[in-house]
Amino acid sequence: MHSPKRNYDIMQISVPEAIQQMDPEETLFSHPVDTEPYNALGIGPGLGSNETTAIALIAQIRRSTCPLVIDADAINILSSHRAWMQQLPKDIILTPHPKELDRLAGTTSSCCYERLMKASELAERLQAYILLKGHYSALCLPNGHIDFNSTGNSGMATAGSGDVLTGIITALLARGY
């Protein structure tokens, strides 16, 4: 786990088994990490959105050599730096909730179908996987197909659970799924 220096003690106490890599900055993500030793990388939850972090994020995305999952603050940074979206690697996974998708697409959708079509178009244009979170989460594939998860419940689409979902997807990618 890469985290600002200030988080070291709390991380040691709450998740002692986590391997930590501390950012040189006290309170923000400022430098990309070497991803060579990793099988997957999840970026976004708790990241923050200041300009130093935004620059470090795009540098991290460019330098990453492993599969990436982008969520939360990382999605918001990409939404405010739209030109950077063209630099995303093929097959990246983006996990927006509906409002984050609206920001990514640069439009506002009032209906679910319209939003779903925007997610599908964006996935095709970026050659990315977009998991649009909701009661029935939709996975928009780079080839234009859309798969729905109609099993389970909307627990992972509930406010505050996106960080957990990012971790689960990242862990599955790291295991080779």
Question: Regions from the language model: what does each represent?
Answer:
Residues 103, 155-177:
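Short, small-residue alpha-helix embedded
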Residues 2-151:
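Glycine-rich phosphate/dinucleotide-binding loop and adjoining beta-alpha-beta core of small-molecule
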